[in-house]
């Protein structure tokens, strides 16, 4: 099915709010500290990602939309790191620097897919003059289709009513991800996007769908909102609008690893889609699909147009089944951040038989994820002769992708997958047959990266060549 994504390249969005830097330290935990009963993490990977309002801007820019970010920062390394990273993603930063305050920074230490501790470095910006923020909003109103106010209660949005009034006077939609229980400060917004706990903290505990709808409609009337979108985790999301039936959308997430930043993704996709000229219902549809993508990643993350298109077509955004090489690299990177061991093998897999299935199941048991690289049709002909393959590449990959033991399937055009393996660098490279490890394509690259290479036995009596010969013999009778 062809999916028509919104014309994101025509969308202009301004994001105003609490800007943060998210830092991540990853590493294995092998012992307990002699100083205190706490684990010792040997840090081997350090990452810095924009968080808060900056993550909203990243999500918008990653879709190909024009994102302009306004917020309060210090004059420090964290602010410079934010500006550098955001510029690489084509986010236009227009920060207001506050010399007396540090840039808000959150440091997370993770090991084996578990967050061990979070350290926050911040001082509230509540006393800072908001007028420079108002000036920046005024300057941008003629070139944007949506204004996002990203509220983390850190002080950047002390004058929300002024910001809403400026945008509404220019007929620009105002989308707000709320914080706290004082929804009065968001009066007149186009759309609020509270999660279920935030919604119930204001409206009260809801025992049924009807009660949620009833209380949501009261909030819309009480605070003069155009719409309310309640995000409900595994229950999806619910859109409420005056004089319209509620729109319930089930979740599209297939695996949930981390909900960090999921709300930023939702409001970012909503804003970009509305600014591109789509309806609110369409915006919610794409935002729901994007949320299913981002919770399958670790930490604050963004969604690309390819991932979004795959998600609305029903393909798992975390990457399962048939993939392009670039999609595979992204999926492997996410798996590594989750501490998963990646196993890789390759072959023609022309006529899938019991020996193949047994071999792949055994390979999968050696790690957490299994990649199968498949020779293209041209590569197979060079390797096996003009009569092969019997089954074309697309069919071979679909069948492999349907196996429970196989996570990712990718093709390669060369005679060997050496280039592909060098780009993926699995933790374990396996091959079936009577090879010596050093004879296996890609073994040198895997060893050089600290990985392992292993030879597994094929099941006796199973051979694609023998199956083909038997079919030919039977057909000649």
From Swiss-Prot:
Gene3D superfamilies: 3.40.1190.20, HUPs. This is Bifunctional protein HldE. The gene is hldE. Its EC number is 2.7.1.167, 2.7.7.70. ATP binds at residues 195-198. Catalyzes the ADP transfer from ATP to D-glycero-beta-D-manno-heptose 1-phosphate, yielding ADP-D-glycero-beta-D-manno-heptose. One of its GO terms (molecular function) is heptose 7-phosphate kinase activity. In the N-terminal section; belongs to the carbohydrate kinase PfkB family. In the C-terminal section; belongs to the cytidylyltransferase family. GO terms for cellular component: cytosol. The active site is at residue 264. Residues 1-318 are annotated as: Ribokinase. GO terms for biological process: ADP-L-glycero-beta-D-manno-heptose biosynthetic process. Pathway: Nucleotide-sugar biosynthesis; ADP-L-glycero-beta-D-manno-heptose biosynthesis; ADP-L-glycero-beta-D-manno-heptose from D-glycero-beta-D-manno-heptose 7-phosphate: step 1/4; Nucleotide-sugar biosynthesis; ADP-L-glycero-beta-D-manno-heptose biosynthesis; ADP-L-glycero-beta-D-manno-heptose from D-glycero-beta-D-manno-heptose 7-phosphate: step 3/4. It comes from Salmonella arizonae (strain ATCC BAA-731 / CDC346-86 / RSK2980). NCBIfam families: cyt_tran_rel (TIGR00125), PRK11316.1 (NF008454), rfaE_dom_I (TIGR02198), rfaE_dom_II (TIGR02199). Pfam families: CTP_transf_like, PfkB. Residues 344-477 are annotated as: Cytidylyltransferase. PROSITE patterns: PFKB_KINASES_1 (PS00583). PANTHER family: BIFUNCTIONAL PROTEIN HLDE (PTHR46969:SF1). Keywords: ATP-binding, Carbohydrate metabolism, Kinase, Multifunctional enzyme, Nucleotide-binding, Nucleotidyltransferase, Transferase. It catalyses: D-glycero-beta-D-manno-heptose 7-phosphate + ATP = D-glycero-beta-D-manno-heptose 1,7-bisphosphate + ADP + H(+); D-glycero-beta-D-manno-heptose 1-phosphate + ATP + H(+) = ADP-D-glycero-beta-D-manno-heptose + diphosphate. Homodimer.
């Amino acid at each position: 099915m062809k999916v028509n994504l919104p014309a994101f390249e025509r969308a202009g969005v301004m994001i105003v709010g609490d800007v943060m830097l998210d830092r991540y330290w990853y590493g294995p935990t092998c012992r307990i500290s002699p100083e205190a009963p706490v684990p010792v993490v040997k840090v081997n990977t350090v990452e810095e990602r924009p968080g808060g309002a900056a993550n909203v801007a990243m999500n918008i820019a990653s879709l190909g939309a024009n994102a302009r970010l306004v917020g309060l920062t210090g004059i420090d390394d964290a602010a410079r790191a934010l500006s550098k990273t955001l510029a690489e993603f084509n986010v236009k930063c227009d920060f207001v620097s506050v010399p007396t305050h540090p840039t808000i920074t959150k440091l997370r230490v993770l090991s084996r897919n578990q967050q061990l501790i979070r350290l926050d470095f911040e001082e509230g910006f509540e006393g800072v003059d908001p007028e420079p923020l108002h000036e920046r909003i005024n300057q941008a109103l003629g070139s944007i289709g949506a204004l996002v106010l990203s509220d983390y209660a850190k002080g950047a949005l002390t004058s929300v009513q002024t910001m809403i009034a400026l945008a509404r006077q220019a007929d620009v939609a105002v989308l707000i991800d709320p914080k706290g229980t004082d929804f009065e400060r968001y009066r007149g917004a186009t759309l609020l996007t509270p999660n279920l706990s935030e919604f119930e903290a204001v409206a009260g505990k809801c025992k049924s769908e009807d009660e949620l709808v009833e209380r949501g409609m009261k909030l819309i009337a009480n605070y003069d909102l155009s719409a309310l979108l309640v995000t409900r985790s595994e229950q999806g999301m619910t859109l409420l609008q005056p004089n319209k039936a509620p729109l319930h959308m089930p979740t599209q997430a297939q695996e949930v690893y981390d909900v960090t930043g999921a709300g930023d993704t939702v409001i970012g996709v909503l804003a970009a889609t509305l600014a591109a000229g789509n309806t609110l219902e369409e915006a919610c549809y794409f935002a729901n699909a994007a949320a299913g993508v981002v919770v399958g990643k670790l930490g604050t993350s963004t969604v690309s147009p390819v991932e979004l298109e795959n998600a609305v077509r029903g393909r798992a955004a975390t990457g399962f089944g048939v993939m392009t090489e670039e999609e595979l690299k992204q999926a492997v990177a996410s798996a590594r951040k989750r501490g998963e061991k990646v196993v890789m093998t390759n072959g023609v897999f022309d006529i899938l038989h019991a020996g193949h299935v047994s071999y792949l199941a055994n390979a999968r048991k050696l790690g957490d994820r299994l990649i199968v690289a498949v020779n293209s049709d041209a590569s197979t002909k060079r390797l096996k002769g003009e009569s092969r393959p019997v089954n074309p590449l697309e069919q071979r990959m679909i069948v492999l992708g349907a196996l429970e033991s196989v996570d990712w399937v990718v093709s390669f055009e060369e005679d060997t997958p050496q280039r592909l393996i060098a780009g993926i660098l699995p933790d374990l490279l396996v091959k079936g047959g009577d090879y010596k490890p050093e004879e296996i394509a890609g073994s040198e690259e895997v060893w050089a990266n600290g990985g392992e290479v292993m030879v597994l036995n094929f099941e006796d009596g199973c051979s694609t060549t023998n199956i083909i010969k038997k079919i030919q013999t039977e057909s000649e009778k």
